[in-house]
């Protein structure tokens, strides 16, 4: 029997048993599709984690005010909201040599307006190292100058989403916009970072110098002198991160005069630990998805076997 004879015999058998052939093919297709989908979901989730790591940095610590160590977040009250200050930032900079960059920040939300265009966005009042810590670069215009950080100058650097909303295809450099009721001059625009690992639009933001935010944007909030809402830092070498975290915690407890056994009035968040936890969760989910895909293949195989047996 030639190859053509074999092919004709096979086609004749398929036509004669089209239902069995269709169901057999469907079982194979469902099993393979399940495997492909499950693998794709696992790889997509891992890609999101990698994106989060690149956006947040694996050599970074974030310090926020509030009582309590670790656990499920800060237990905030009006008296514990401003427990960090610029003195803490400078102490970390000078006393912990493993720290590469450190910056304090204030933050809030505001309405940003230019001509007939307006949008609700978030603002951050920052110190010089903040840009290096967060991977921000200036793509148009220039960054803040040294005097801007000390004189409460009304200069602003805008994110890509804000630039596009207010100015369309223009850069907006040199234009005056309003944050709330306060006029600011646009001196620069930031590189686009897209959606963050937690789903937020990282480009929907404007930056002003820390002292500018304190005097111009915080309003009647009644900040303690030199207070900041956040301190972020990076270390030069990732292997020093855990050691630096311990040093930072000890330094802040000393500066804040926290007695042994008392709770911290701050929280230190280790980004690498968060990423490790999320990665472990993703790996577990990938294993579960793989098990589901395997079950789908087995069920498909059993279905094929049953159809073949019935047709005999």
Model-predicted regions and their roles:
Residues 1-32:
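N-terminal Sec/SRP start-transfer signal
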Residues 29, 38, 230-234, 267:
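Short aromatic/hydrophobic contact patches that present stacked aromatics
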Residues 13, 27, 34-42, 286-312:
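A hydrophobic alpha-helix feature that marks transmembrane segments and, especially
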Residues 42-122, 129-132, 147, 164-165, ...:
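Hydrophobic, regular-secondary-structure patches
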Residues 6, 10, 24, 48-49, ...:
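Hydrophobic alpha-helical segments typical of transmembrane helices
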